[in-house]
């Protein structure tokens, strides 16, 4: 895979194989029995699926070495932040230059 070393490729492939085995070990329940029995089997199946999903996330985060969540948005330095209550356009939260401002729609 591009941008990765061979060792991490093998570790990633091994993690994917483990996750695949986990999901294959929990097949969807068979549609037989009473309505209540089927409902209980589906409920237990969904609970196992949630557990498998959380285990899979832990395996991947350990293997890849980064959290599954995206990196938080980087804000500009605190000195450049201000509260602007005007209705003019521009990026909110950052100071705009005080030069010529063109207003659309004003005569």
From Swiss-Prot:
Annotated region described as Disordered, given as residue ranges: 26-50, 82-107
Motif (Nuclear export signal and binding to XPO1): 73-84
GO MF assignments: DNA-binding transcription factor activity; RNA binding
UniProt keyword annotations, A-Z: AIDS, Host cytoplasm, Host nucleus, Host-virus interaction, Methylation, mRNA transport, Phosphoprotein, RNA-binding, Transport
Gene Ontology biological-process entries: mRNA transport; viral process
Modified residues (Phosphoserine): 5, 8, 92
A Pfam match: REV
Cellular component terms (Gene Ontology): host cell cytoplasm; host cell nucleolus
InterPro entries found in the cross-reference section: REV_protein
Compartments, record wording: Host nucleus, Host nucleolus; Host cytoplasm
Top-rank lineage group of the source organism: Viruses
Biased composition (Low complexity): 86-101
PTM remark: Asymmetrically arginine dimethylated at one site by host PRMT6. Methylation impairs the RNA-binding activity and export of viral RNA from the nucleus to the cytoplasm.
Motif range (Nuclear localization signal and RNA-binding (RRE)): 34-50
Composition-biased stretches (Basic residues): 36-50
Region Homomultimerization, annotated ranges: 18-26
Domain notes from UniProt: The RNA-binding motif binds to the RRE, a 240 bp stem-and-loop structure present in incompletely spliced viral pre-mRNAs. This region also contains the NLS which mediates nuclear localization via KPNB1 binding and, when the N-terminal sequence is present, nucleolar targeting. These overlapping functions prevent Rev bound to RRE from undesirable return to the nucleus. When Rev binds the RRE, the NLS becomes masked while the NES remains accessible. The leucine-rich NES mediates binding to human XPO1.
Misc note: HIV-1 lineages are divided in three main groups, M (for Major), O (for Outlier), and N (for New, or Non-M, Non-O). The vast majority of strains found worldwide belong to the group M. Group O seems to be endemic to and largely confined to Cameroon and neighboring countries in West Central Africa, where these viruses represent a small minority of HIV-1 strains. The group N is represented by a limited number of isolates from Cameroonian persons. The group M is further subdivided in 9 clades or subtypes (A to D, F to H, J and K).
Subunit structure: Homomultimer; when bound to the RRE. Multimeric assembly is essential for activity and may involve XPO1. Binds to human KPNB1, XPO1, TNPO1, RANBP5 and IPO7. Interacts with the viral Integrase. Interacts with human KHDRBS1. Interacts with human NAP1; this interaction decreases Rev multimerization and stimulates its activity. Interacts with human DEAD-box helicases DDX3 and DDX24; these interactions may serve for viral RNA export to the cytoplasm and packaging, respectively.
Family note: Belongs to the HIV-1 REV protein family.
Function of the molecule: Escorts unspliced or incompletely spliced viral pre-mRNAs (late transcripts) out of the nucleus of infected cells. These pre-mRNAs carry a recognition sequence called Rev responsive element (RRE) located in the env gene, that is not present in fully spliced viral mRNAs (early transcripts). This function is essential since most viral proteins are translated from unspliced or partially spliced pre-mRNAs which cannot exit the nucleus by the pathway used by fully processed cellular mRNAs. Rev itself is translated from a fully spliced mRNA that readily exits the nucleus.
Name listed for the protein in its UniProt record: Protein Rev
Organism in which the protein naturally occurs: Human immunodeficiency virus type 1 group M subtype C (isolate 92BR025)
């Amino acid at each position: 895979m591009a941008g990765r070393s061979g060792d991490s490729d093998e570790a990633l492939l091994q993690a994917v194989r483990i996750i695949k085995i986990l999901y294959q070990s929990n097949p969807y329940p068979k549609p037989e029995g009473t309505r209540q029995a089927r409902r209980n089997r589906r409920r237990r199946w969904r609970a196992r699926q949630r557990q498998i999903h959380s285990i899979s996330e832990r395996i991947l985060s350990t293997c890849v070495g980064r959290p599954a969540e995206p990196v938080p948005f980087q804000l500009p330095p605190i000195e450049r932040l201000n509260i602007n209550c005007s209705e003019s356009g521009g990026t909110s939260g950052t100071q705009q230059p005080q030069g010529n401002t063109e207003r659309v729609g004003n005569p």
